[in-house]
Structures are given as structure tokens and as C-alpha cells.
Amino acid sequence: NLKKLLSNQNIEKIFHFARADMTFIKQYLNIKVQNVNCTKIMSKLARSYSDRHGLKDLVKEFLGIEISKQLQSSDFGGTLNEKQLKYCACDVIYLHKIYSSLKEILIREKRYELYKQAISYIDTRVDLDLALFTEDIWSH
């Protein structure tokens, strides 16, 4: 069962831009995803030398592979075609490798604990998004 898997604290989940996925999951499945990691947040803390933190950029930098995001906006509402299935599978395969590389950098740069603190805020950010608070409530 997908709900059990996503809410299981003992199983680590890796997303890229977890905030969006978790908002969708909470809204439609009414569950809180547990034990979450986000390669986008990791990238922003680990790769402070760059302003390019999209999955396409990370795949290129860490894996040396050019990926097309053309299918990203295709219709995933019905039966998926071969290209869509491959797109989804590649995202999952790439995320594990990227996660490992980013974690290594965060540990080396002594930013891993900061990342853990940042990711612990994601549940609150999801709740704010669902309550339609899209502005940064911490800004002046």
C-alpha cells in the first residue's frame, strides 16, 4: 500500500523538490510523508556556488548525463506511455546517486546538520502551502 510506504518512518524517501510532492500527497492521500530527503534543498546548501538546482542540472553535474525535461509537463493523468515510464524511472534512478553525492558534500563542508534542521521544517512548509500561505512568513 502506497500510504503505508510513504508514512513509514523506517523507509527513507528521496524527492527532488519534496515540498511540491508532499503537498500533493497530503492533499490527495491525506497522509504525512515520513523520513524525507530533498535533493533540491541539499543542493542549495551543498552547492552554494551555483544558482542552478534543478534536477536536470544536478544530473548533468554529478552523472554527466543530459536529460530532457520535455515530458515533465505531459499528461500523467491516464495510462502512461513508454516514454513517460522511462522518464519516471530515470528520475528515481538518478535521485539516489545525486542524494549520495550531495550528502557527501554536505558532510565534508560541515553542513549536513544544517540540512537536517532545514528538512525538518518541510512538514510546516507543506501545511503553510495547503493553507495558501505562499509568501515567506519569515521575511520582513
For the regions a protein language model found, what residue spans apply to each?
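Mixed-charge, glycine-rich, non-catalytic linkers/tails in nucleic-acid processing enzymes
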Residues: 82-140
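Conserved DEDDh/DEDDy metal-dependent 3′-5′ exonuclease domain
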Residues: 1-105
